[in-house]
Each structure stands twice: as structure tokens, then as C-alpha cells.
């Protein structure tokens, strides 16, 4: 029992350490995004013009979220807990706000952004629940699945939505919902393509480190959930893990 506890404690310590690292990386990316696309610091020497979203650099335009995001919602498919219970724990199974389980097959393969569609869709500040995901995974139908398009990288899309107040487009008195139609009501500023390409190159290294930390946490979660019950029951000895 003591060995199992120390094993669990070790996994949790590494898990939370990686979480803190990723929180810091997210803050770095968000600060850079704010500097470029909220405060317009690199463009202050140029002319600003009025728009629906206030003053923006000349040559930029106002669009909506689906001008820069491609949706893959039609590919989603929920799996019941009964369907998942006998599956090997290999690929993440995502819900509206987090990994719900691991399964032995996948629908998506690549880098995507998930945004809660119904149930839990925003925090108390009105910001959307987002999950930056990558690799092979499965998603149920409670999260919109999207990627950046038109020279907006998925990483840039993530930065844009992190601090975007979406409360005006959320519907549902009993259960909150963000429909695809209402996603078009999320207005965004679109800079020229060359600017989005340069910015994406600046934040890509930050997200690569984030991916590395997240992969380690997924591995730790699987080890925790599969090995610890065996350690607790005595079916597995600590020497078996070390070997």
C-alpha cells in the first residue's frame, strides 16, 4: 500500500509540474498575441482606422470566426461508457472540457482546437472552454472540433479565443449551447496574410514545448489509471514496473 501511494504521489507531482509549465507557456503566447492583435504595438507607426471592433491598423478587416476556422463536427461520434469500458487505453477520448477516457481507436489525427458546444461552454468571465489537442484522438459531440484556415494557424486560433468573451452568443436556458450558426457572430480582426504567417512562426516553438509536456502527462495518466489498481491489489510488484 505504501509503495502504491509513493508511486501515485510521484506521478501526480510530475503531472502537476508539467501543468504549471504549460500554464506559463500559455501566458507567454497570450501576452504576445495581445501585443500584436489587441494593442497593435508592432503597428503603431502606421495609420489606424475605425471598424466594428474599434480602431484597427489600416489594411486589416473585420470578419467572423468561421472565416478563419474550419469545422470538423460532422466527423464526431460519441461512445457510451459501456462501449469504452473494455477498450485498451491508447488514444484520448475528449468531451466538452477535458479528456474523459482513453480508447483503442481514433477519428482525428493532427492538431485541432476543441471548443465546448453544450453543457460546460464558458467560464465565469465568459471565456470559452478550449482544448488544444494533437495526435490521434476521439471526440464526442459535446465539443466543436476545428482547425485554423486562411493562414490562421490552429495555435493562433487558440490564442484568439482564449480571452474572447462569447457570452452574447451562448443560448439555452437549461443547458448552455454554442451553435455553429452563432459562431459566425464571433467577430475577429483579420490582419494581412503575411502578418499571420510571421506571428504563427513566433508562437510555434512555444506550442511545441507545450505538446511535449502534454504527451508526458497523457502517458502518466495512462500509467496511473492502469498500473496503480494492480499495485493496490498485489497483482503487480514495483520491480515489475522497473523492469
Briefly describe each language-model feature range:
Residues 1-78, 83-95, 189, 193-235, ...:
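Non-catalytic DNA-recognition/assembly elements of restriction-modification systems
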Residues 47-48, 56-57, 61-191, 239-243:
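DNA target-recognition domains and sequence-specific DNA-contacting regions of bacterial/archaeal
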Amino acid at each position: 500500500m505504501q509503495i502504491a501511494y509513493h508511486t501515485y504521489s510521484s506521478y501526480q507531482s510530475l503531472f502537476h509540474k508539467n501543468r504549471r509549465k504549460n500554464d506559463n507557456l500559455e501566458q507567454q503566447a497570450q501576452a504576445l498575441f495581445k501585443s500584436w492583435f489587441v494593442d497593435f504595438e508592432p503597428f503603431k507607426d502606421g495609420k489606424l482606422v475605425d471598424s466594428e471592433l474599434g480602431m484597427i491598423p489600416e489594411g486589416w478587416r473585420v470578419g467572423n470566426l468561421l472565416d478563419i476556422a474550419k469545422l470538423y463536427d460532422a466527423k464526431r461520434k460519441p461512445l457510451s461508457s459501456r462501449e469504452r469500458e473494455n477498450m485498451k487505453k491508447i488514444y484520448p477520448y475528449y468531451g466538452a472540457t477535458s479528456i474523459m477516457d482513453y480508447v483503442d481507436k481514433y477519428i482525428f489525427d493532427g492538431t485541432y482546437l476543441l471548443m465546448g458546444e453544450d453543457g460546460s461552454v464558458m467560464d465565469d468571465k465568459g471565456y470559452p472552454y478550449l482544448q488544444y489537442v494533437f495526435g490521434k484522438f476521439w471526440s464526442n459531440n459535446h465539443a466543436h472540433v476545428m482547425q485554423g484556415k486562411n493562414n490562421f494557424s490552429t495555435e493562433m486560433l487558440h490564442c484568439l479565443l482564449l480571452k474572447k468573451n462569447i457570452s452574447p452568443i451562448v443560448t439555452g436556458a437549461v443547458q448552455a449551447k454554442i451553435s455553429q450558426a452563432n459562431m459566425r457572430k464571433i467577430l475577429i480582426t483579420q490582419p494581412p496574410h503575411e502578418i499571420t504567417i510571421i506571428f504563427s512562426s513566433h508562437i510555434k516553438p512555444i506550442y511545441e514545448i507545450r505538446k511535449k509536456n502534454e504527451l508526458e502527462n497523457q502517458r502518466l495518466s495512462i500509467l496511473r489509471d492502469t498500473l496503480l489498481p494492480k499495485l493496490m491489489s498485489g497483482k503487480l510488484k514495483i520491480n515489475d514496473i522497473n523492469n
